[in-house]
């Protein structure tokens, strides 16, 4: 774990509005234990360093892979009621609705950690469900998943802009104005975005592609540190034109 005092600017003139501080949290992937720890760290940081307007931005991929997707969504819903927060959609949040309407989607979803999500809702899937089991599991999930969980995942934003910063799950397609970006790219893009060294319209804060430590570039920062496998959930604290600190579990 680390609590780095970054206080550095790698992106030129990009800055947040005066008085705004953003806590951006990377991919959680079913690790409710780490999310709970991180939210406590953020609360402690806020108490030590009061800000006129603190916003927590969650970068998506709350479910799958880790053991406690249901508990993660409960924590996020509780946070939504008490704090100023922005919840972005990750590619993994698209699987639930797709599976409920077309159970064979589980062929793809299980390869992305979907079975762990089903287990968190009390279902008991086999390792490689056939079509009849997929249909049964979809019916069981429809009965067991709280409506507020479905409504939460359906309400997630694709991006959030604040000052000169853009917060998004995966990234953006280079050369395409932000207003014209496609949902598929915002949720899934990798190489074309990651390899681009040119300045973007805004400095991009993202997750989606796991890295060992936060990857800070001149045009973006990646804070997906593979929490479900590494035990390291990362939060970038941004204020003015600098990363004030990097919090980690």
Which residues are covered by each model-predicted region?
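Active-site neighborhood of phospho(di)ester-bond hydrolases with catalytic His/Asp-centered motifs
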Residues: 25-26, 57-60, 86-90, 203-209, ...
């Amino acid at each position: 774990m680390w609590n780095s005092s970054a206080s550095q600017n790698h992106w030129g003139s990009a800055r947040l509005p005066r008085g705004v501080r953003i806590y951006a949290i990377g991919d959680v992937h079913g690790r409710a234990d780490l999310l709970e720890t991180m939210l406590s760290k953020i609360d402690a940081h806020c108490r030590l360093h009061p800000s006129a307007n603190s916003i927590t931005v969650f970068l998506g991929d709350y479910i799958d892979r880790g053991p406690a997707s249901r508990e993660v969504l409960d924590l996020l819903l509780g946070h939504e009621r008490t704090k100023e927060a922005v919840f972005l959609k990750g590619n993994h949040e698209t699987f639930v609705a797709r599976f409920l309407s077309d159970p064979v989607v589980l062929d793809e979803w299980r390869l992305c950690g979907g079975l762990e999500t089903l287990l968190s809702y009390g279902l008991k899937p086999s390792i490689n469900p056939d079509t009849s089991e997929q249909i049964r599991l979809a019916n069981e999930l429809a009965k067991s998943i709280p409506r507020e969980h479905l409504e939460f995942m359906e309400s997630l934003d694709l991006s959030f802009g604040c000052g000169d910063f853009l917060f998004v799950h995966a990234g953006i397609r280079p050369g395409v104005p932000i207003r014209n970006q496609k949902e598929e790219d915002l949720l899934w893009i990798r190489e074309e975005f990651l390899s681009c060294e040119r300045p973007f319209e805004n400095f991009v804060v993202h997750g989606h592609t796991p890295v060992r430590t936060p990857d800070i570039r001149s045009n973006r920062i990646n804070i997906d540190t593979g929490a479900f496998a590494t035990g390291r959930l990362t939060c970038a604290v941004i204020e003015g034109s600098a990363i004030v600190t990097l919090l980690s579990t």
